[in-house]
């Protein structure tokens, strides 16, 4: 059975050494002149199995590595944004991943986010515990870690420090996330235990161990997945859309199965539909020593087979976006390929809600990833699209917010905001959150949501009528009626202009027309403990339906009482709560229902 190269992606937290490790892996070769060294593909680097065997020759016997895969195809773009963008039907394009963790710093937010994405995509991974050379006293040199890991080479204190950092900063965190993990040389059951491979991207220590472990695991557990359809047509994913001088718009793609030929037809799935076009050229990069003219960087290939990175030149690629699924087929298979692509796009369709926010992303895979994370944060999503933030998006978000201010949000992942959209944004209350890190955008969403909920809660609370109890002061009746004017003391709560007043037998007496302070200045409200003159317009006649020392109540509707009691009770001051409870007790007695207000 013919096997293709496993596709390998590198993930990890910022500054933990993803790019440096990739550079070190790409530069792996026994000598500069070695035949079959690293082959640079479009968007990926192929490390042939012979190169892996040569740099790892001291390890082959230790791990009983009988490797028959042709090599490893390592995606050039590190990070989980690239990982999520590169999708195929059924999950991630990458067959296996390297999770880079700084052995000295341990897990960070992006490390955990990367693990969550790997779990979600069911992608097996190996941990590269990087920056081994920074452990105090560690003697790091290019070559296998396993040969350098002994007390003949290392000081005992350095060995002890290594063990502490390996456990405290890497293995313990993996255990907390539900994974068994251990140093790769101690792993007995690779189906249950994550391999942790210590490396230094600076010295190259551990890179041979990492390559042999990745290759061995891929062959052992992914053989069926790596079976190559040597007769079938090419299946792949768009990595990037680029303008190239002399070629126009081209696409860089990873082909993960089958064979593509010049003159075949490319079928690409887009959010807006399917694009078909005739392949003008399949291009591979020239070797470095052939790149004398920067305008002539590529050489045409009549035929390419998986797994590989390739640049494709074809007309009518304007609407293609990164992360789109593709097929390259003979003309007679176009309809079949279109059906496959349609089914694949349906897998990417994100379920939307009747109400919610808008999310935009640069690729379908990224859109799916951020939608999944926002769902975990309990976000409702009204619209999810690939592409830049447009004026139309702002207008739509503004209309969504008219029914609920919590819908007036656009989350933009790794996309631009068009100039007319920026102008429209200034005219509205729509909030735009932009970023290139998924976990940070989700955090920003959580912070915005909390702030908005508090603001809305405060606004609604301020609009509600709050209970208050007042007492008519003796010797302070200034006018009997039309309006009645008297001095009152606020016993509980806050008395406001416009509040409707009732007696303790439920009679409506009128509304508060005016409140004055001791300087005879009009004020809008009087709080607990204050003694103030008030005028009450309506049915109140002092000396008849209201007398000195009477306790009066601010009238509150039952729906408002329910909201105050069930939603906002914790937001009320102690005296306001007391006013609410006493008012409810009075109304339950008057209405002869213990459920009033409940």
UniProtKB/Swiss-Prot annotation:
Q: Which residues cross the membrane?
A: none
Instruction: Mention any one GO cellular component term assigned to this protein in its UniProt record.
Output: cytoplasm
Region described as G5? 200-202
Q: GO: which molecular function terms? A: GTP binding; GTPase activity; translation initiation factor activity
Region G3: list its residue ranges: 76-79
Q: Name one Pfam family in it.
A: GTP_EFTU_D4
Name the Gene3D superfamilies for this protein: P-loop containing nucleotide triphosphate hydrolases, Translation factors, Translation initiation factor IF- 2, domain 3
Tell me the segments the record calls region G1.
Answer: 12-19
Instruction: Give the span(s) annotated as G2.
Output: 37-41
User: Where do the tr-type G domain residues begin and end?
Assistant: 3-225
List the CDD domains: aeIF5B_II, IF2_aeIF5B_IV, IF2_eIF5B
InterPro entries, per the entry: EFTU-type, P-loop_NTPase, Small_GTP-bd, T_Tr_GTP-bd_dom, TF_aIF-2_arc, TIF_IF2, TIF_IF2_dom3, TIF_IF2_dom3_sf
Function per UniProt: Function in general translation initiation by promoting the binding of the formylmethionine-tRNA to ribosomes. Seems to function along with eIF-2.
Describe the family membership recorded for this protein in Swiss-Prot or TrEMBL: Belongs to the TRAFAC class translation factor GTPase superfamily. Classic translation factor GTPase family. IF-2 subfamily.
The protein here is known as Probable translation initiation factor IF-2
Coding gene?
Answer: infB
